[in-house]
Amino acid sequence: TESYFVFSVGM
């Protein structure tokens, strides 16, 4: 899962 990617989008 691209959790880090989703986190970046959340920022």
From Swiss-Prot:
Keywords: Antimicrobial, Plant defense, Secreted
Keyword Secreted appears in the UniProt entry: yes
Primary location recorded for the protein, binned into one broad class: secreted
Keyword Secreted part of the UniProt annotation: yes
GO annotation (BP), single: defense response to Gram-negative bacterium
Disulphide bond pairs: none
Function, as annotated: Has antimicrobial activity against Gram-positive bacteria B.subtilis (MIC=150 ug/ml) and S.aureus (MIC=170 ug/ml), and against Gram-negative bacteria E.coli (MIC=170 ug/ml) and P.aeruginosa (MIC=169 ug/ml).
Quaternary structure (record): Monomer.
Protein name (database record): Antimicrobial peptide 2
Natural source organism: Cocos nucifera
Record lineage: Eukaryota, Viridiplantae, Streptophyta, Embryophyta, Tracheophyta
